[in-house]
Curated annotation (Swiss-Prot):
This is Large ribosomal subunit protein bL19. HAMAP family: Ribosomal_bL19. This protein is located at the 30S-50S ribosomal subunit interface and may play a role in the structure and function of the aminoacyl-tRNA binding site. PANTHER family: LARGE RIBOSOMAL SUBUNIT PROTEIN BL19M, RIBOSOMAL PROTEIN L19. It comes from Nitrosomonas europaea (strain ATCC 19718 / CIP 103999 / KCTC 2705 / NBRC 14298). The gene is rplS. One of its GO terms (molecular function) is structural constituent of ribosome. Disulfide bonds: none annotated. Gene3D superfamilies: 2.30.30.790.
Amino acid sequence: MNLIEQLEREEIERLGKTIPDFSPGDTLVVNVNVVEGDRKRVQAFEGVVIAKRNRGLNSSFIVRKISSGEAVERTFQTYSPLIASMEVKRRGAVRRAKLYYLRDRSGKAARIREKLPARSVQQENVAEALQP
């Protein structure tokens, strides 16, 4: 194991942040700490994850949303102290790791299908038992 990787892993553990499991296509709500003068408040940024960059402590992700008809993209550092919390609102079914093509699309063309939860073996057995 590399010394730098070990230090990064220890730093991530020290931060103790709970990062939800998300992937591109998911709708994510990121609560960000915003400092305005002497006041500190939490601002929610909800949008679709269009890219995720996994680099240990330097991991980041890009969230895109449409605000008042204008597209807004924001890059977040995954382990940033500015992020108060993250929540996955909706899982998206996509076949790409980077969804940059959404930048060229608007309206219904920019929709993402919802990923349905996988059926477990137990559910299938119950469904078969219920059929006459």
